[in-house]
Amino acid sequence: MAGIPRDNRPVILTYHDIGMNHKTCFDVLFYDEDMQEIMRHFAVCQVNAPGQHEGASTFPAGFTYPSMDKLSETLPIVLKHFKIKSVIGMGVGAGANILTRFALKYPDLVEGLVLMNINAQAEGWADRAASKVSQSNAIVIIILLTPCLNITIPVSLQLCRLAGPT
């Protein structure tokens, strides 16, 4: 949790995509100079999916990863722990899917959502990972998230140039 929640403002709640954690997914955004003004006015709570935090151990044999629904059901517990009354959810990929499920189940806790690269299918994390590397999805992901993730695509691979930082 970064910042101090204010009674009259929602907390920004982030949820990352698969293969990432809150640092690898959101640090580029939250440490950007232009974002500092927002950070002075809002607290941020960044959630890591099980096993995605830095230094996480591998899962034991036979471990079944929680479904998107189960992951969304953990969020009210996090909010209660930090005494958070409402959030603006910010999710990427599978994190966007999880936050959408959370908002549908707990609409009174959600002021709004910022969703990037959402896939609304009811798939598990393994299926999501497989779809990420499919040819068409990989191109779309790279092109859409390049400005957010500070990735440079070689000119020879660029199909079109999108507005944003280069």
Predicted regions and their residues:
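Flexible "cap/lid" loop of the alpha/beta hydrolase fold
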Residues: 97-140
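Conserved alpha/beta-hydrolase "nucleophile elbow" surrounding the catalytic nucleophile
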Residues: 16-18, 87-96
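Conserved HGGG/HGGXW glycine-rich cap/lid loop of the alpha/beta-hydrolase fold
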Residues: 1-60, 64
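Alpha/beta-hydrolase
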Residues: 136-166
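Conserved acidic catalytic loop of the alpha/beta-hydrolase fold
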Residues: 68-88
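Eukaryotic intrinsically disordered and solvent-exposed regulatory patches
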Residues: 1-2, 29-33, 63, 77, ...
